Amino acid sequence: MAQVAIITASDSGIGKECALLLAQQGFDIGITWHSDEEGAKDTAREVVSHGVRAEIVQLDLGNLPEGALALEKLIQRLGRIDVLVNNAGAMTKAPFLDMAFDEWRKIFTVDVDGAFLCSQIAARQMVKQGQGGRIINITSVHEHTPLPDASAYTAAKHALGGLTKAMALELVRHKILVNAVAPGAIATPMNGMDDSDVKPDAEPSIPLRRFGATHEIASLVVWLCSEGANYTTGQSLIVDGGFMLANPQFNPE
């Protein structure tokens, strides 16, 4: 029986690229979408072209806990789960002094509560299967350093990083490995870009002087799902073109 990977928010961007690269590795793929059903269907068509199975379902992590139950439907349809990639997320920007509490809670509901519930559903099934598994949380460089005027997003990503470590420690006894991937400035629809925007010298403030491509995140996710990562758990792997190394003394010239 084929292994199964479920990637949340895989209708576009990093999630879609994770789905396609894992399909190339022979995984059957569970695809979720929030508002772009056609994007999810496009992902499914590309996944199936690699000779594996694809199932799609709408996932609304703004409506919890009920919304997360869609993950159970995917697991039932696919028969099992071996990998969960928590890619769904939300963000908003506002100065700390102006941040409304309901906006703060919306970000935490999707980015932290949603990942918690999806991980719990997946991990319980993995324990039941008795063969271990992998859970990968897509965080952000802002898990490690603040984004100005985005206190809710920054705090939520820090919380998801902490949850990653707590899950890793508790689930290792079940051979479930839990890690995070922390992207920097990646050319995704959330950032108003796509991979065509990955051009040399497009972003001089980043030491590599460009935005990242979605496959540069997804390829690390694939590695974390491989035997090569059998000794890796509780880590947050930063992929940022050197962004975290830059400081006021950094001269892009």
From Swiss-Prot:
Its EC number is 1.-.-.-. Substrate binds at residue 140. GO terms for molecular function: oxidoreductase activity. NCBIfam families: PRK12743.1. The active site is at residue 153. It is an enzyme of class 1 (oxidoreductase). It comes from the Bacteria. Keywords: Oxidoreductase. This is Uncharacterized oxidoreductase YohF. The keyword Oxidoreductase applies. NADP(+) binds at residues 6-30. PANTHER family: 3-OXOACYL-(ACYL-CARRIER-PROTEIN) REDUCTASE, 3-OXOACYL-[ACYL-CARRIER-PROTEIN] REDUCTASE FABG. GO terms for biological process: lipid metabolic process; monocarboxylic acid metabolic process. Belongs to the short-chain dehydrogenases/reductases (SDR) family.
